[in-house]
Amino acid sequence: MNVSAESGAPRRAGQRHEVGLAQLPPAPPTTVAVIEGLATGTPRRVVNQSDAADRVAELFLDPGQRERIPRVYQKSRITTRRMAVDPLDAKFDVFRREPATIRDRMHLFYEHAVPLAVDVSKRALAGLPYRAAEIGLLVLATSTGFIAPGVDVAIVKELGLSPSISRVVVNFMGCAAAMNALGTATNYVRAHPAMKALVVCIELCSVNAVFADDINDVVIHSLFGDGCAALVIGASQVQEKLEPGKVVVRSSFSQLLDNTEDGIVLGVNHNGITCELSENLPGYIFSGVAPVVTEMLWDNGLQISDIDLWAIHPGGPKIIEQSVRSLGISAELAAQSWDVLARFGNMLSVSLIFVLETMVQQAESAKAISTGVAFAFGPGVTVEGMLFDIIRR
């Protein structure tokens, strides 16, 4: 006798049983997304953190604030950052005090972003056997500049990409934008396995620097740096053998955390793009990361102990510390994130790709494949990330 799954009642022979898509087992993937090329870059200007602290302190008249500022910079655990412009330079100081309008700053962003983004994109594609026509999608991610036609159009023209290329611009997704962009590119190449996608993240926080009599401005300036990263994404048949150094994107994930809207707030003021980080953000991260990651791993037949690599967004000491604490993993597993934070500061969407690059470059002969989880945080608060494998040998 046939029985209805919903009610347990007998079902007559020949009666059609409706099955929703959600009840069907997932079809095995025929293709997987692979990071085939990766390059990073920064502006040439190196800013020493202790020097920056001393110079910022001089801007404040209140003795208490002047004494507090060096401690803020020291707690950042950042040694150096790279910047397109020095926001404490005399010329930029005049530009800032006029004050510079949002229009002025966006033109400054474009001026410095284009050559850096073009250079990094060329290096990501260097040595790969692609014709320009094979790059079918360009995804540009940034939260520090918006102008159109913008950096994406400049990349298309400078690299000689097809004028019919699809373009997606991811704006104002904050530090999580690289994962959002990567997810878009992954979906594209799996749907169009003969084509490639180029993901470019460019962040120039320095062009938006503002110093008012506000400790939030000081905290923001103590953390953020400038940088660029580019990824070339292709598709591979699941049974294909991949070369060492390739990164397989097994799955992407995104979760909007409840009641955390104040955690990360990006905005636009008359004189630039603004960022506010709530004192509640570390608590949101501690309570939110483990449930999101654990569920994603469960969906992929894994658990936290199965993960070899943890690419945690190096957004600041509390971001890394609370992520580690939430997951219950060894502090040593966040070493690459701490290293990127110390050398470059928080480069928003770019930072996580720097961490991933470090992991790819570190040889590990003990295992043929290293499995990792990468994640970052955006306004919402949103946790965006991916499960990946690095092919070692």
From Swiss-Prot:
Family recorded in the similarity comment: Belongs to the thiolase-like superfamily. Chalcone/stilbene synthases family.
Entry EC number(s): 2.3.1.-
UniProt keywords, alphabetically: Acyltransferase, Fatty acid metabolism, Lipid metabolism, Transferase
Catalyzed chemical reaction(s): hexanoyl-CoA + 2 malonyl-CoA + 2 H(+) = 4-hydroxy-6-pentylpyran-2-one + 2 CO2 + 3 CoA; octanoyl-CoA + 2 malonyl-CoA + 2 H(+) = 4-hydroxy-6-heptylpyran-2-one + 2 CO2 + 3 CoA; dodecanoyl-CoA + 2 malonyl-CoA + 2 H(+) = 4-hydroxy-6-undecylpyran-2-one + 2 CO2 + 3 CoA; dodecanoyl-CoA + 3 malonyl-CoA + 3 H(+) = 4-hydroxy-6-(2-oxotridecyl)pyran-2-one + 3 CO2 + 4 CoA
Residues given in the record as substrate binding sites: 221
Active site positions: 175 (nucleophile)
Gene3D superfamilies: 3.40.47.10
Protein name listed in UniProt: Alpha-pyrone synthesis polyketide synthase-like Pks18
GO molecular function, one term: acyltransferase activity, transferring groups other than amino-acyl groups
Keyword Transferase tagged: yes
Residue ranges of the region described as Disordered: 1-26
Enzyme type, top EC level: transferase
InterPro entries, A to Z: Chalcone/stilbene_synt_C, Chalcone/stilbene_synt_N, Polyketide_synthase_type-III, Thiolase-like
Oligomer and partners: Homodimer.
Site (Important for broad specificity for aliphatic long-chain acyl-CoA starter units): 205, 209
Pathway(s) served: Lipid metabolism; fatty acid biosynthesis
Effect annotated for changing residue 209 to F: Retained reasonable polyketide synthase activity with lauroyl-CoA but cannot use palmitoyl-CoA
